Amino acid sequence: MEAKATAKYVRVSPRKAGQICDLVRGKNVDEALAILKFTPRGAASIIAKVVKSAKANAENNHEMDTEKLYIASIVANQGPTMKRFMPRAMGRATTIRKRTSHIEVVVKEKK
């Protein structure tokens, strides 16, 4: 049995979010939350929120034991990019890409 949680259109770069995902992939849920709590990155708090949501979904919707849960899969896929323009010298303008992510967490019960 597995439980999922997703956060879509999160205003964090998928590359930066992916680095944080690599830290907790395969870990126990409580251990992963402890790691994320002390990780000094902006994406860590967002990912922690999604992991907590997956844990709550497992407990309430699937009646799974929260002590045995581990992160089976965690990915930060690329969402749509917002394009903004920044004025530069001599009448030019450059694009600034504000990237978004779709974060998906799947938790399973250890046997």
From Swiss-Prot:
The family database entries (SUPFAM superfamilies) matched by this protein are listed as:
Ribosomal protein L22
Q: Does the keyword rRNA-binding apply?
A: yes
Which keywords does UniProt give here? Ribonucleoprotein, Ribosomal protein, RNA-binding, rRNA-binding
Q: Which Pfam families does this chain map to?
A: Ribosomal_L22
Q: Name one GO molecular function term.
A: rRNA binding
Q: Which family does it belong to?
A: Belongs to the universal ribosomal protein uL22 family.
Q: What is this protein called?
A: Large ribosomal subunit protein uL22
**Record organism:** Clostridioides difficile (strain 630)
User: What is the name of the gene encoding this protein?
Assistant: rplV
